[in-house]
Amino acid sequence: MGYTLFRFIVPFNPYFSSFYPSFPFYLSFPFCPSFPSFLSFPSSIFSLSFPSFLHHHLLIFSSLRIPFPWFLPLLQLVYLCYKVPWLLEWLIHSSKLAYQCCRILIFAQLVSLVRNQKH
């Protein structure tokens, strides 16, 4: 299997091997499909520079262990939210609706469990 090189602008502290908000440092690493699907460090086929108000969010984002197939779409979504201001508002609104729907479904499931135990 061939190797593909991914590059990403990341805040990186070589002394503590942890991420901190100062840009830019380049981390490059070979990615092989036989590697584990969970990566504990950021990766991308393109480099991005984010404004300072996104540093904190990127710091949280980069320290998550995200399954590799999901990482690029999530990163692109973060970039789109920066470029298209109303998109973030719409996503927050949609996630609140989804959260409320989940609460209703969980409550309905609990009610049905209680009813089944009574019979």
From Swiss-Prot:
Its main location: membrane. It is a multi-pass membrane protein. The chain crosses the membrane at residues 19-39, 68-88. One of its GO terms (cellular component) is membrane. It is found in: Membrane. Keywords: Membrane, Transmembrane, Transmembrane helix. It comes from the Eukaryota. Almost completely overlaps SIK1. This is Putative uncharacterized protein YLR198C. It comes from Saccharomyces cerevisiae (strain ATCC 204508 / S288c) (Baker's yeast). The lineage of its organism: Eukaryota, Fungi, Dikarya, Ascomycota, Saccharomycotina.
